[in-house]
Amino acid sequence: MPTKTIYFSKARTALKYGLQALELNDQDIILVPDFVCDSIFQPIQQNSLNFSTYELEDDLSPKWSSLDLLITKKIKAIVMIHYFGQPQDVDKFIGFCKKHSIFLIEDNAHGHSGLINGRELGTFGDIGISSPRKFQGSGGVLYLNKDYKESILPALPNEEPRASSSGLKFLLNKIPKFKHLIKRAIKKRPKYEDPRAFREPSMDDFYLSKESAEEMVRINWADIRNLRRNKFDALQNIALNGGLKPIFSKVHNESNPWCFAAYAKSQEEAIQWFDWGWQNNVEVFSWPPLREEQINSNDKAFLRWQRIVCFSTDS
């Protein structure tokens, strides 16, 4: 289990200070999967580090056959992402890192409280991050599994607690048809087909507020995991009946899936699903916002992005 757990307002802040715990040198290189939200590169750049990307299979596992070829003396760490809350082959990543004497950075931003054999995702790497913000609106967790200098932990203010909207959300969820009518009356469908529409700007660093941390402890995460896995199964049936190809053949039995994700045959078909979701009160969206150079070069990750359709497992 981690030697230290620290609560920040966002996962990217947790990653920023987690990287400092690794005590890497300027311009050291981190291996990052090519299919990832562009916000992960903010803390890498803030720490004066470089990155190289590695390719993925259709199930978003690494192309292991080519990964060894990327190792150089400047490679000091690799990022392992549990996409959409589904666990990677953790043992294989750990073995790869031991073979090449590099650090394992575990990114569980999509699956907070998910487990493997009873152990929480995010706690296997030399450092790990998780994002309860995906589930409760705020919070980024840093897990440290190595000795670190206390100086890496800065004097930061706590995030101001947000006004709770859970009561209103509960009432609206009791009358979903009314909720859907309100949403469609005051909003237009987000432009999920726009690869630049959902980028997140750099933000100030905060620790998580005391109120949010206490709320996180009170939440019954086991119930949330069960509800989301059941929703995953229901969404998978919808997707299969609609001709989509699931990224994962089944949901992991201890996971906390942020969403169900599948491949459409084309971006045109993906857009049809975005429209269908908006019309039928089902949250269907795209992910991730990629780096600008990936969009401009029409690279493999961008072509993958054009076809991926995500269905929220939030109740």
How would you describe each model-predicted region?
Residues I129-S130, Q136-A163, N173:
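Active-site-proximal region of nucleotide-activated glycan assembly enzymes
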Residues P2, I6, V36, V79, ...:
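PLP-dependent aminotransferase class I/II
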Residues P2-T5, T13, Q20-N108, H112:
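PLP-dependent aminotransferase-like
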Residues E106-L142:
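Conserved active-site segment immediately N-terminal to the catalytic lysine
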Residues T13-A14, V36-D38, D59, Y83-Q86, ...:
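Short, solvent-exposed loop/turn segments at secondary-structure junctions
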